[in-house]
Structures are given as C-alpha cells and as structure tokens.
Amino acid sequence: MPSTGTLVIIFAIVLILCIMLLFFYKTAEAGKSGVLPPPIPPPTPPPPKKKYDHNEYMEKTDLEPEVKKNHRKWANEAEHLISSSVKGLENLDETAFLANHKGHGFRTFDHAKSLFKEFLKKY
C-alpha cells in the first residue's frame, strides 16, 4: 500500500487535472456562438404622440355651426385685443394709472406705485 505522502501527491495531481479540464471545458464552451447570453436589446422608444388636430376636435364637438365656423376668427380678434391692451399698459403713465384708480383701495401713493409696477411685470 502506498504511503500517505504518495496518496496526497496523486490526489493533488488528479485535482489539478480536474481543474484544468473544467477550465478548458468552460473556455471552449464560451468560444462557441450562441452560448453567451443574448445582448440586451435597446429600450423601445415610446409610441409617437398623436398630433393635435384642431379641425378633428371641432368636428367632434357639439357646438352650433356658427361657432364652429367663426371660432378661429373670434379667437384671433380676442388675442389681438389682449395684446394691444397689454402694449398700451406698458406705455401708460403712472400718474394716469393712479388718477384712474384714485380711492380704489390703495393705502398710499407708494403702495399704488408698487402695485402698478407689479402689474407691468406680469404683462
């Protein structure tokens, strides 16, 4: 019967051969195509949002025919009035503003001036 030292050496050699065989098997397997996991696909982009179609919206609404026909013209007129009044306010003199609003809840002249300046900043 072989001695203990010889058995340990034989066991170590067998263990090293098994590890080498396992390593060789893994590297050979990794070289094959199709063994690696498939690549992660790129994220799919969200579906495109449907563009707002005003004419389609107006067809679906149950407005009177006159409103459906003239709503765009009325909206343009209102927008023009608002923009022109805001432009007029930008050129308005502070004294005219205060004269028109005298006695309408302003505590002092400075309070009225500060409110007027805040109003102009908003528009």
UniProtKB/Swiss-Prot annotation:
Which positions form S-S bridges?
none
**What are the alphabetically sorted keywords of the record?**
Host membrane, Late protein, Membrane, Transmembrane, Transmembrane helix, Virion
Which coarse location class describes where this protein primarily resides?
host cell
Q: Where in the cell is it found?
A: Host membrane; Virion
Q: How does it sit in the membrane?
A: Single-pass membrane protein
Please give the residue ranges the record annotates as the region Disordered: 32-53
**Swiss-Prot/TrEMBL induction comment:** Expressed in the late phase of the viral replicative cycle.
Q: Which GO terms describe its cellular component?
A: host cell membrane; membrane; virion component
Q: What are the transmembrane regions?
A: 5-25
Source species, domain of life: Viruses
Q: Compositional bias (Pro residues) spans?
A: 36-47
Q: Which family does it belong to?
A: Belongs to the asfivirus CP123L family.
The name this protein goes by in its record? Uncharacterized protein CP123L
